[in-house]
């Protein structure tokens, strides 16, 4: 499986690395592929990139699934940086050493809002999925994993230009004590 330590761990955790799996996430929602993306997240990807595909296309293409995962990681990192959530990096919240990979892991389970609520509440808002997995569980599991194995993230373009350097995504997850 190509990519980062984070991505390999995510695929193993979500699907045992099975790119062709379709799982009932409860409430009539299905999640698909090695990383178990739901329809809403796949629609976010298609809207952002202009690509279009069916769930069947997605399940049949490991390359497409890896592209979506690349986009997903970058999208969560951009969201965290644009919303000042990097101020939590280096802290431990409810047993989660907060770094970029923990943030992406928490957002993968609970969405960007669930991750943000967890951080801003000091861990008090720690939602769980239908299997009983808490956002904090994913934070602990994925903290310290390298996100970008092949290329560092690109700065996201905005109408006013590039984000200033102090808000640009950091290229690698870093040990909690090293973030300033």
Language-model-detected regions and their locations in the chain:
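Non-catalytic cell-wall polysaccharide-engagement segments
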Residues: 1-28, 34, 40-180
